[in-house]
Amino acid sequence: VSGVDDYNTTADDNHICDLSYQYNETHITIQSNGLPNHDFHSGPGCCASAQDYSWTLPLTPTNDTDCDPDLATTGCEMAPERGPIAISVNGVPFFGPEDGPGGDAVAGNEGAYEEDRQNVWLGLCHGHSGPNGVYHYHADANCVHWHVDESAGETWLDYSINSSRSGSEHSAIVGFAFDGYPIYGFVGWDENGETKEITSSYRLKEGETGYNGIEDYEYLAGIGDLDACNGRFSATPDFPNGTYHYVSTFVNGEGGTGFPYFLLCYRGEAESGNTDEGGGGGDDPDCSGHGETWGPGIGPPPPGCGGGGGGQGQSSENGIASIPWFKAPPDSGAILLSLLALAFVAAAGLRGSAYPAVASGRAGTAL
């Protein structure tokens, strides 16, 4: 498998994106090293390095009954202002809009204000690395699906966010939130089944620029396509009967910034323990309690532990190439769609697409 390069170094880095997983009847635990499947920029926080992530997500999301994001974020669990809020299909964490100084990193990167507190800029796919070499995305993340046409002399530097925004087909899943709901790319279907860029319903408050981060924005229901969490219920190629899902947005319904870019709150009940950078670390995990506190029909394994004995609890070998192929989305929960997405990373190679082409109608995925 061909590795990828960090454009902030002079060396041929040959970084390898690596994932493995275990699952049982209720949860899936994904281990990743946090390195992407595409070339990237570490940015001022150079340089990105392999991490030890373990993310646990529910196979079947459960709505938070206290949360009504059509109205506001009141009653909803807010995504962390710093650190991971979701996971990409390549195992790289999604962060919220704010970066170290407290400003909206995406708005600053797009020239909405001058960041004078710290040197912050975003590279390919609006990602960069932070303290301890933690690579992450603040927006976009559609690099996981983009093809480099080497015969035409292309490199990853030819990737353009507009190529992901102007597609004639429904976008693929780019990741999953910690409540188990999928996150799609920019393009979705309108009420007539036609493709369009999906827009945020947030806008800057009068006189603000994003310099103060989240507090500079207000939710105004109806100006865009999405609710206060940056999600909606609608049909997708993977769920022709409809599902709640979040959308990676780059503009709002008025043509302004697409804050919050991924999600601001969780419509479902988010799994605890994922927001501390995936529970990674160097200590050996405590795997006691199998059959009593965790295991098939009981709950997910502790981070870093295998799936346990028998039943539907399963474990993969290390390495992304071990992820299996599913011809159609499995019935055992929405989150297993991530395995299908990750299988394409393995099947097509790390420099190829991480997901299949999808049909432009509402009938489903064309495989």
Q: What do these predicted ranges mean?
A:
Residues 1-116, 123:
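Solvent-exposed N-terminal domain segments of exported/luminal and surface proteins
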Residues 3-15, 66-76, 102-116, 148-167, ...:
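Surface-exposed intrinsically disordered loops and tails
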Residues 43, 120-127, 226-234:
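Short, recurring structural edge motifs at helix starts
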Residues 57, 90-92, 131-144, 239-257:
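Extracellular/lumenal glycan-associated surfaces
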Residues 89-95, 99, 103-156, 178-179, ...:
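Core of folded catalytic or high-affinity ligand/protein-binding domains
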Residues 169, 174-281, 285-310:
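Extended, compositionally biased non-globular segments
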Residues 319-338:
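Juxtamembrane/start-of-transmembrane alpha-helix segments at the extracytoplasmic/lumenal side
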Residues 343-367:
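C-terminal membrane-anchoring or membrane-association module
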